């Protein structure tokens, strides 16, 4: 317990089930285990990773399908089959895929949070900017253009305190900490959803939010699917929380077959 902290990710039992410390009282802690706990008993070993629940941010996020703790379902299915066993620890981003990085900065350039090191053409229509992480400021010592895996070193950054850090294509970020931003722009442009009733009577602004309340079976998920399919946006992030299995199956079957009318892809 001396090395454990609130919200640390832990591994529980022989199967190393993934959990999170949600409460601490002296030498006792309450752990929320994110997997089936059958078979756990008194005396089972619990090991703290020493880090909070975090996600990986970098090239490869787009077109991916994850569970609630960012484990890639596609690669897990390939390795372990459709019945996912407990305790799987799979990296969120493919460690073997190679991306072409185009550097925009060079030796001696000063950088701060949000400054763009360079870009990766992640999809045919999305250019992924590799940026300096929040709370980091310093001077670029090295930065290379070329083909890299997400964990390869693409350069070096000398921080203001004199320490030197490697620059890679991937960043880790704790899920309970909001990403900082310099400012928030007011919504001024409508988002065309493709649903005439919504666009005419209940318009939604780009940068805004929408709430679709209703009882069971009223079509809330259908509206969500339609907005995700046809809205005038560059990128759709679909999150299914508490959805029926058949509804999520529809998403996985239909969305990859859609064609974006703006790009033809």
PLM features: residue spans?
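Short, solvent-exposed secondary-structure boundary/capping segments
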Residues: 28-34, 72-78, 129-130, 142-144, ...
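N-terminal accessory targeting/assembly segments
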Residues: 1-85
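Conserved hydrophobic positions within beta-strands
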Residues: 21, 65, 116, 140-142
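Short alpha-helix capping/helix-loop boundary micro-motifs
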Residues: 1, 29-35, 95-106, 139-143, ...
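The Walker A (P-loop) glycine that initiates the GxxxxGKT/S ATP-binding motif of P-loop NTPases
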Residues: 214-215
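Conserved P-loop
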Residues: 221-264
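ATP-binding Walker
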Residues: 218
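P-loop NTPase nucleotide-binding/switch module
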Residues: 78-124, 128-133, 149-209, 223-226, ...
